[in-house]
Amino acid sequence: MKAVLTRVSSASVSVDDEIVGAIDCPDTGGILALVGVGAADSDDAWETMVRKIAELRILDGEQSVSDVNAPVLLVSQFTLHGRTAKGRRPSWSDAAPGEVAEPVIEKIAQGLRERGITVEQGRFGAMMKVTSVNEGPFTVLVEC
């Protein structure tokens, strides 16, 4: 499982020009989490990802999402598993198929909510437009 976590002051995701998820957090900051589920991920990788999103100290002042009750915008991003070493067209064979990935993304969202974190989401499998105001910029790649 891979994720790109970006510290933001606001972020939104739209499908067909309709906003389906948004966070606005100029005081605490928040996290835009682009998460890709891999075909070879362990059954409990989602739990590690929940912990990383909630506890990594990547907000202002070395605070975590849990420390300051910051919101998360969670967007499924299978393209994080694209292989680009050969040729000009990425291979997506390392990404989990949709029927495997979608429930994992839902487990991550639920796991964050169970920690009391506000979670907004994109729409799985849809063509989405993601907008963000990055802070820093501060972006990290998480693999688990």
Curated annotation (Swiss-Prot):
One GO BP annotation of this record: D-amino acid catabolic process
CDD domains named in the record: Dtyr_deacylase
Motif (Gly-cisPro motif, important for rejection of L-amino acids) on chain: 136-137
Reaction(s) catalysed (UniProt annotation): glycyl-tRNA(Ala) + H2O = tRNA(Ala) + glycine + H(+); a D-aminoacyl-tRNA + H2O = a tRNA + a D-alpha-amino acid + H(+)
HAMAP family: Deacylase_Dtd
Family of this protein: Belongs to the DTD family.
Function: An aminoacyl-tRNA editing enzyme that deacylates mischarged D-aminoacyl-tRNAs. Also deacylates mischarged glycyl-tRNA(Ala), protecting cells against glycine mischarging by AlaRS. Acts via tRNA-based rather than protein-based catalysis; rejects L-amino acids rather than detecting D-amino acids in the active site. By recycling D-aminoacyl-tRNA to D-amino acids and free tRNA molecules, this enzyme counteracts the toxicity associated with the formation of D-aminoacyl-tRNA entities in vivo and helps enforce protein L-homochirality.
Protein name (record): D-aminoacyl-tRNA deacylase
Record organism: Corynebacterium glutamicum (strain ATCC 13032 / DSM 20300 / JCM 1318 / BCRC 11384 / CCUG 27702 / LMG 3730 / NBRC 12168 / NCIMB 10025 / NRRL B-2784 / 534)
Gene that specifies this protein: dtd
